[in-house]
From Swiss-Prot:
GO molecular function, one term: transferase activity
Disulfide bonds: none
PANTHER family: LARGE RIBOSOMAL SUBUNIT PROTEIN UL2M, RIBOSOMAL PROTEIN L2
Assembly with partners or alone: Part of the 50S ribosomal subunit. Forms a bridge to the 30S subunit in the 70S ribosome.
InterPro entries registered for this protein in UniProt: NA-bd_OB-fold, Rib_uL2_dom2, Ribosomal_uL2, Ribosomal_uL2_bac/org-type, Ribosomal_uL2_C, Ribosomal_uL2_CS, Ribosomal_uL2_dom3, Ribosomal_uL2_RNA-bd_dom
Protein known as: Large ribosomal subunit protein uL2
Keywords: Ribonucleoprotein, Ribosomal protein, RNA-binding, rRNA-binding
Domain of life: Bacteria
A cellular-component GO term for this protein: large ribosomal subunit
Chloroplast among keywords: no
Family to which the UniProt record says this protein belongs: Belongs to the universal ribosomal protein uL2 family.
Biological process (GO), any one: cytoplasmic translation
Cited function: One of the primary rRNA binding proteins. Required for association of the 30S and 50S subunits to form the 70S ribosome, for tRNA binding and peptide bond formation. It has been suggested to have peptidyltransferase activity; this is somewhat controversial. Makes several contacts with the 16S rRNA in the 70S ribosome.
């Protein structure tokens, strides 16, 4: 993986960097037609047209690639035929050709190459791209696309450069302990499946977007501070010049306390499976 730097020919180019796709991707062709569906841009609106997620809108038109997060094709070998760009995520994807003729997209893991064979099996080899249940994976192994519920599909560690580490297994064999990239340590059912290795494109977080326009191409709109709004737009707004917010503590646009307020529901069932919270990682 390599980062491409640009000369300062314009203000927008100064300090701008991108991922060198030519060093990783194998094709500039269109994606597999059978695994592509249309995608309507919601621009952060719900079915009533009301904004439910701010700072979204615009951006380039995209088509959605159907990714196999379940990896439920058991004991059938597949060969990596291409490594492709996916506009819907910061990780790359691989096209897998299975011996029975079926094709599926999976997440690209660090170390994958065209021609490699991968398999999802109860006793799969501990090799990058293979899938196995957590109970059969040795301690210390780095994993991604980890299930939280057996058969539901991977939900943990799916973004670029992310991974979790298997720390240990319970004596009764029901749960295994994982350390997430956030520092959180939690238990997961040993029957859940996970993919061996780390997600690729690990240098994505080093990209300098260079100018606001590149974020607009991605569908990200500006984030405006409440203190520079009018009073009818935000509780922090109004006043002459740079006025203080006029409250004991900062609040959200809807008047609820912000910054430092715990928002997690302590009655969640998964609360008892969290051994160490990410806030206590030190």
């Amino acid at each position: 993986m390599a980062i491409k730097k640009y000369k300062s020919t314009t203000n927008g180019r100064r300090n701008m960097t991108t991922i060198d796709y030519s060093a990783v991707l194998t094709t500039k062709n269109n994606p597999e037609k059978s695994l592509v569906v249309s995608k309507n841009s919601k621009a952060g609106r719900n079915n009533r047209g009301l904004i439910t997620t701010r700072h979204k809108g615009g951006g380039h038109k995209q088509k959605y690639r159907i990714i196999d997060f379940k990896r439920n094709k058991r004991d059938i070998f597949g060969t990596i035929s291409t490594i492709e760009y996916d506009p819907n995520r910061n990780a790359f994807i691989c096209l897998i050709n299975y011996v029975d003729g079926e094709k599926r997209y999976i997440l690209f893991a660090k170390g994958m190459q065209v021609g490699m064979k991968v398999v999802a099996s109860e006793n799969a080899d501990i090799k990058v791209g293979n899938v196995a249940p957590l109970k059969n994976i040795p301690e210390g192994t780095l994993l991604h696309n980890v299930e939280l519920k057996p058969g539901k599909g991977g939900q943990i560690a799916r973004s670029a450069g992310s991974s979790v580490q298997l720390l240990g297994k319970d004596d009764d064999g029901k749960y295994v302990t994982l350390r997430l990239s956030s520092g959180e340590v939690r238990k997961v059912l040993a029957e859940c499946y996970a993919t061996i290795g780390e997600v690729g494109n690990e240098e994505y977080n080093l990209v300098n977007w260079g100018k606001a326009g590149r974020n607009r191409w991605r569908g990200i709109r500006p984030t405006v501070r409440g203190s520079v709004m009018n009073p009818n737009d935000h509780p922090h707004g109004g006043g002459e010049g740079r006025a203080p917010i006029g409250r004991k503590s900062p609040v959200t646009p809807w008047g609820k306390k912000a910054l430092g307020v715990k928002t997690r529901n302590t009655k969640k069932t998964s609360e008892k499976l969290i051994v160490r919270k990410r806030s206590n990682k030190k």
